[in-house]
């Protein structure tokens, strides 16, 4: 299995003439590494974060089909996995060469994954998995579901650590440049909430365009990143750099 744990792999600077909302971001070798990993003619399975958001899921599938085409990565077919065909999850996973785990609300996506027993379905998967945002977060063995929606930071019943897909031990926190100054329920997202939750835990904090590439037991951090552990935030890498984990 080859695993890409991304914040967002999307670049909104679309070349003239392409009718797409975004293309894959070539920064930090992402497109090059993806091309080298995907078998030509593979089937792409996009697993939704919200299983009932049919229109949005179909729109996302069309967008990423275009992203692969723009990156000159040949696909045989593109399929969405949501509540319309969740009963066929095992078959769809088995016939896919590339699986994309969508971004969205971490607990919502996590519950959908669990309802299909996706952790076991992916245990022997030998293709390429691309996590995006929440999808990357849910790849962890134990997921840190950083509070995101109003009320979650002060809800004593909100579960911040939940069982994930077990594809990595790394906890990813995405979109750092966009959310680093956010305030949720009167608390600063990183200084007040995440720093306290990092006691005994390690979080890899990524801006869009950065990712972790895991293959054959090796893990490489590609692009700018920070690490938070026991309440301390430190810069790990700059954009364009790589770090073996």
Q: What are these language model-derived features?
A:
Residues 96:
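An anion/phosphate-binding loop that grips the pyrophosphate of nucleotide cofactors and donors
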Residues 106-115:
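Glycine/threonine-rich flexible loop motifs
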Residues 100-102, 123-142:
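Catalytic nucleophile loop
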Residues 92, 115-126:
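Catalytic-core regions built around general acid/base machinery
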């Amino acid at each position: 299995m080859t695993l890409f744990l991304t914040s967002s792999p999307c670049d909104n600077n679309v070349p003239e003439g392409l009718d797409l909302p975004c293309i894959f971001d070539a920064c930090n070798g992402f497109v090059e590494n993806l091309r080298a990993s995907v078998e030509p003619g593979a089937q792409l399975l996009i697993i939704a974060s919200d299983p009932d958001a049919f229109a949005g899921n179909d729109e996302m599938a069309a967008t990423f089909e275009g992203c692969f085409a723009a990156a000159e990565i040949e696909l045989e077919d593109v399929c969405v996995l949501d509540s319309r065909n969740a009963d066929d999850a095992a078959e769809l996973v088995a016939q896919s060469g590339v699986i994309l785990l969508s971004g969205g609300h971490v607990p919502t996506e996590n519950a959908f994954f669990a309802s299909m027993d996706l952790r076991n379905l992916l245990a022997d998967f030998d293709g390429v998995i691309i996590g995006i945002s929440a999808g990357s977060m849910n790849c962890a063995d134990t997921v840190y579901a950083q509070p995101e929606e109003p009320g979650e930071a002060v809800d004593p019943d909100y579960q911040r650590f939940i069982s994930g897909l077990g594809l990595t031990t790394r906890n990813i926190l995405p979109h750092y440049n966009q959310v680093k100054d956010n305030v949720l329920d009167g608390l600063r997202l990183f200084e007040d909430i995440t720093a306290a939750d990092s006691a005994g835990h390690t979080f890899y904090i990524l801006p869009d365009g950065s990712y972790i590439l895991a293959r054959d037991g090796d893990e490489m951090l590609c692009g700018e990143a920070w690490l938070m552990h026991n309440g301390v935030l430190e810069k790990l890498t700059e954009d364009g750099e790589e770090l073996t984990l």
